[in-house]
């Protein structure tokens, strides 16, 4: 093949005719240069910039400008490729032997994912130079899944593999997989398996799972105590459970029944443990009928002298209610379930010629109000207090007459049940709980203002008269402080009162203490951080927003920040380190607004409003685990009065 002829140099295309013509005249050659100096001749030549390759693009860019490339799929694609290589046995440099199983892998992949393998392959261990390593105390299938996880970052945790996968992940220090196993077990907690999961977590040092499982056992003890797992527990663990202050039980009867069931599951071997177990049952909190009809009748209990002493202690607690303050022990302290939170209940009240039987409750954890079951009787000017895990609505006014009736609210069943009536009709009364007893003082019986007082024992279902106050008081409030009752202010049918008196249950005596700075009836009274607070009320001329505080140590009252709204016929309660002023009347209308006081800042701020306007309302707080009750409407209202 002949080479293609090239156009002669110095020729160009004529722009006019398109035919060859003479090119431009060549420049003359440069004149000869004189010889360079010696130093110049010996200097190394600098390299010339390389001529651009044919077809290359000459870039003109700002100095220092560059572009970073980041492939988000690089790691994924690389590990996918390595996983395929492992499956085909390519470039594998380690074989793991466990039982009869062989697992091929790459040391660098295992060492990069597992601190266990990193130490094995990078330190001066013999395995670092070996191509075959035998592992012990690990399930073969679990190891295979974890090696595969090292390449794919994916693993499925389920009922079929979690019990082998978790210890294997712990051994290899694959904490992410270990946490996934714990999360799965946490989601599977049930009364039938929670004790087993708790033991499994303890055996493998899964502290968070252990705490969660133990909390679940305490919270669901009634159901857990009926399972086979509970019956097989060793004595030490049973003692740990039934002695816990955090046990969630509707009554101490459940603890007693659980203990007896455990003993009778293997009665010959376990009857010797009955005295130790009964010391953990809070017998004084059982009703007298249950003590005599069940505990004293049980042969396993009756035949042990130590158990007889415990039974006598419990009966003495019942027979001497006025001495409960000095008879108190760990067995007389009500249990408080771990995880329970305070719930504020607003009960009854009235608004615009209406008397309410409905009730609502506020959960601070969710900042929501919930409607709960209505009372069987409409009640305004009612006294409300909590004893144990129940709420009591005492007396009041139903729109026709003043009431002696009492009913209690069970938050577990969301129902109200009738209780034994007081000996006297009372509205506008003061009610408070002390040492498991319910006290009612003063009030109005439909004919006269009262100074009498009486006490209710829920364990025996009986009302007993106690010493009368020195002053007749209706629209009075009563609170408990340092083992004593304080009756604050009120109205004696002729004047609004600033006086205060204190009741000491051990001696059954009322005595005067320092009077308030202002006359107040229908005020709110509560105790917070060792001080007695009184807020609002009526002084005979106007509705008040002023607030004062009494210190028993100083024996004097002092003013604190006033409420934002004038209130009387409201109620005051302490909750979560705050004081809550609930409802009431501002002098012209009933209120559904709430405000709360922070003693650390000495300020009142608005809180979420109730559904319903309520004056002459009763308020108390219960510590509840499961709230709200099923099918309860909820409401979140702005922090202003509607």
From Swiss-Prot:
Every copy of the BTB domain together lies at 92-159
Which Pfam family would be a valid example here?
Kelch_1
Q: Which GO molecular function entries does the Swiss-Prot or TrEMBL record give?
A: actin binding; molecular adaptor activity; ubiquitin-like ligase-substrate adaptor activity
Highest taxon, organism lineage: Eukaryota
Q: In which pathway does it act?
A: Protein modification; protein ubiquitination
Region Interaction with PDZK1: what ranges?
640-642
**Limits of the BACK domain:** 194-296
According to the UniProt record, which cysteines are disulfide-bonded?
Answer: none
Spell out the residue ranges making up region: Disordered: 1-53
Q: Name one GO biological process term.
A: proteasome-mediated ubiquitin-dependent protein catabolic process
Gene Ontology CC annotation, any one: actin cytoskeleton
Renumbered to this chain, the Pro residues biased-composition regions fall at 21-37
* Ranges occupied by Kelch repeats: 343-389, 390-436, 438-483, 484-530, 532-577, 578-624
Q: Which UniProt keywords apply?
A: Actin-binding, Kelch repeat, Repeat, Synapse, Ubl conjugation pathway
The subcellular location is: Postsynaptic density; Synapse
> Which segments carry the region annotation Interaction with F-actin?
289-641
Write out the function statement from the record: Substrate-recognition component of some cullin-RING-based BCR (BTB-CUL3-RBX1) E3 ubiquitin-protein ligase complexes. The BCR(KLHL17) complex mediates the ubiquitination and subsequent degradation of GLUR6. May play a role in the actin-based neuronal function.
Q: How does it assemble?
A: Interacts with F-actin; the interaction disrupts the F-actin structures and leads to marked changes of neuronal morphology. Component of a complex, composed of PDZK1, SYNGAP1, KLHL17 and NMDA receptors. Interacts directly with PDZK1 (via PDZ1 domain); the interaction is important for integrity of actin cytoskeleton structures in neurons. Interacts with DLG4 and SYNGAP1. Interacts (via kelch repeats) with GRIK2 (via C-terminus); the interaction targets GRIK2 for degradation via ubiquitin-proteasome pathway. Interacts with GRIK1.
This chain belongs to the protein called Kelch-like protein 17
Species of provenance: Homo sapiens
């Amino acid at each position: 093949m002949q080479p293609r002829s090239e156009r002669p140099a110095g020729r160009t295309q004529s722009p006019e005719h398109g035919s060859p013509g003479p090119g431009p005249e060549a420049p003359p050659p440069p004149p000869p240069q004189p010889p360079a100096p010696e130093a110049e001749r010996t200097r190394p030549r600098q390299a010339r910039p390389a001529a651009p390759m044919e077809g290359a693009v000459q870039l003109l860019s700002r100095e220092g400008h560059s572009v970073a490339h980041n492939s988000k799929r690089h790691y994924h694609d690389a590990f996918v490729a390595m996983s395929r290589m492992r499956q085909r046995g390519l470039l594998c440099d380690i074989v793991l032997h466990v039982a009869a199983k062989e697992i091929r892998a790459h040391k660098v992949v295992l060492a990069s994912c597992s601190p266990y393998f990193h130490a094995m392959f990078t330190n001066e261990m013999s395995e670092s130079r070996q191509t075959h390593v035998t592992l012990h105390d690990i399930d073969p299938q679990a190891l295979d899944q974890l090696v595969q996880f090292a390449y794919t970052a994916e693993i499925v945790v389920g009922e079929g593999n979690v019990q082998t996968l978790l210890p294997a992940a712990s051994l290899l220090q694959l904490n992410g997989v270990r946490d996934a196993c714990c999360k799965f077990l946490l989601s599977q907690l049930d009364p039938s398996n929670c004790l087993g999961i708790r033991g499994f977590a303890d055996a493998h040092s899964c502290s968070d799972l252990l705490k969660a499982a133990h909390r679940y056992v305490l919270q669901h003890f009634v159901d857990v105590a009926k399972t086979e797992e509970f019956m097989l527990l060793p004595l030490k663990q049973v003692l740990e459970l039934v002695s816990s202050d955090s046990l969630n039980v509707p009554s101490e009867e459940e603890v007693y029944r659980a203990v007896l069931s455990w003993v009778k599951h293997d009665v010959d071997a376990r009857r010797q443990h009955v005295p130790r177990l009964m010391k953990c049952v809070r017998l004084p909190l059982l009703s007298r009928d249950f003590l005599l009809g069940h505990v004293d009748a049980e042969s396993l209990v009756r035949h042990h002298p130590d158990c007889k002493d415990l039974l006598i202690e419990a009966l003495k607690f019942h027979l001497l209610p006025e001495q409960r303050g000095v008879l108190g022990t760990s067995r007389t302290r009500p249990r408080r379930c771990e995880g329970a939170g305070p719930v504020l209940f607003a009960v009854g009240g009235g608004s615009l010629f209406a008397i309410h039987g409905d009730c609502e409750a506020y959960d601070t954890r969710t900042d929501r109000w919930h409607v709960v079951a209505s009372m069987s009787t409409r009640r305004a000017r009612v006294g409300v207090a909590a004893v144990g895990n129940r709420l009591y609505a005492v007396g009041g006014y139903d729109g026709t007459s003043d009431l002696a009736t009492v009913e209690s609210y069970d938050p577990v069943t969301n129902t109200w049940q009738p209780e034994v009536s007081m000996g006297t009709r009372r509205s506008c009364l003061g009610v408070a709980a002390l040492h498991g007893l319910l006290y009612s003082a003063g009030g109005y019986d439909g004919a006269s203002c009262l100074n009498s007082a009486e006490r209710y024992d829920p364990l025996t279902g009986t009302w007993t008269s106690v010493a009368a106050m020195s002053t007749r008081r209706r629209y009075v409030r009563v609170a408990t402080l340092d083992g004593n009752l304080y009756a604050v202010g009120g109205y004696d049918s002729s004047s609004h009162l600033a006086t205060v008196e204190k009741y000491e249950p051990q001696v059954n005596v009322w005595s005067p203490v320092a009077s308030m700075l202002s006359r107040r009836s229908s005020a709110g009274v509560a105790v917070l951080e060792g001080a007695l607070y009184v807020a609002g009320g009526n002084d005979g001329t106007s509705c008040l927003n002023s607030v004062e505080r009494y210190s028993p140590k100083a024996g004097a009252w002092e003013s604190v920040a006033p409420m934002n709204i004038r209130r009387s016929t409201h109620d005051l309660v302490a909750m979560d380190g705050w004081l809550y002023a609930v409802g009431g009347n501002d002098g012209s209308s009933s209120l559904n607004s709430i405000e709360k006081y922070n003693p650390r800042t000495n300020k009142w701020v608005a809180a979420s409003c109730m559904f319903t306007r309520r004056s002459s309302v009763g308020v108390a707080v219960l510590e509840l685990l499961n709230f709200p009750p099923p099918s309860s409407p909820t409401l979140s209202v702005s922090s202003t009065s509607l």
